[in-house]
Amino acid sequence: MQMENIEEMPFNHRIWITTNEQIEQVLSYNKNDVMATKLFLDATLGLTEYSQYKGKNKMGLRTALTKKFNVDCHNWPDVRIGEQLMLTLYSRETDQNQWDVRKLRTERSSILLKECVPNWCNIKSKEFNNFLELINKTTVGKDEDFQTSVIFHGIRFDFGLGGTHGCIKPGIYESDKEYVIYDLDVSSLYPSIAKSLGLYPKHLGPDFIKLYGDFIERRIAEKKKPKAERDMVLIEGYKLILNGVYGKSGEETSFMYVLLYTYKTTIGGQLFIAMWAERMVEAVSDLEFLQINTDGITIKLKRTDIDKIKEVCNQLTKETTLEIEDAYYSKMIIRDVNNYISVYEDSTKENEHIKLKGVFVEDVEYHQNSSMKIVPIALKNYFVYNIPIEDTIRNHKNIYDFCLRLKINGSSKGEWHSIEKDNIKITQLTRTTRYFISKKGGGLIVYYNGSNSAGRINKGFNTTLFNRYYKSDNYDINFNFYEVECRKIINMIEDKQLKLF
């Protein structure tokens, strides 16, 4: 949250405070803690400029769901909303006691994957028929995985029980007057497959899918509204509910546990992606696959062929009921399937419309590691606006964006070693340390899990502790360190691209 001070309770909670000095320390900590809580509250209300939370009223979501379904979910974390709402609504719909429903499960020691093939599956190509044959003769145990790969139309499709992935070589790919990067994805893939196939946990019966289908229809209807009219709180809320059901179907502790449901969902998604890719190539033989994801495909093709792909999508929607959304990119910077930048065709520097994934993400959620935000900032400027990384890094004024985070557990010990008047000074670290790489300073050392073996953090570089903010015209930042971090990623993309010629 870029707090000025990062503090922990200065004393163990179980000791008595006996001096005025200790009282002042505790009061200072409490004041900082209240300020942090207020900042986090503002974020949950969407009252922040931080992009991950701006305009996303998470408390409003819970209030809206509470009013609509008469179920108080204000104190539930995101991951519990789907399961808890479904439990309450299902129990209410079927007039059952929640505690009885909680105990329900469908146990199976193994799954014959042939059972998971959708009734609308219509694979034609030799490559994907080999994949289908493998599915039809494979049995997996509840703790086993299923993985295989298929080379189709010049790209490798990697299939696993968790989804489908594929990616072209690292590089920079651009649209022009003749060709365009066309991105397509299935709206709410896993929930939509469940609805398409009428899936429900056997022990819960068909009443389950009625409730589930209602969530799907409401979310899709909301997303179809003009952007200014969409209720993003409801869209995000229904997303949590829908995705939560799929996730919980694979957890033995959940009342929705049934592995056949999980596998029918994922195998159905994989076979849809295979059918989709086949139909695309059949319609436009010279298209180029850029990426394949669990719920979508990104291609490059002639602008004059777009309507042919749209016809393919419309036909597949008729056959499967899965609805497909599309977008156009002017440029993609790809490191791999999980790390890329997509620039939408309507994006401008004044009104950016850019998708950032993996190492290119600038704003992560508060519970994630936001170290070295300057690196993705510089990478975006470099790849999208042709601004040298040195210009971004050396002219950037927000010191927080250069900071890194070190977290250590309770059984480990962290120290900062520096030289003061020709003597080594050892500063004990708290469990969370904020710092940046500097030209002068000290070294970070961690003794893990009570051992005497020390591990050096950012070995070979000096660091400056920054748990407490201070203003300076010259923070003595080691800009070279951050530039090298950027170059590591740039070289993965540009060097490999040059080797293609």
Feature locations, PLM:
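Conserved "right-hand" nucleotidyltransferase catalytic core of DNA-directed polymerases
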Residues: M1-E7, R14-S188, S192, L271, ...
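Generic detector of well-ordered secondary structure
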Residues: A36-L39, G244, M275, K318
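Surface-exposed polar/charged interaction patches
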Residues: R92, I123, T138-G141, R218, ...
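C-terminal, non-catalytic extensions of nucleic-acid polymerases
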Residues: E107, P118, F146, F152, ...
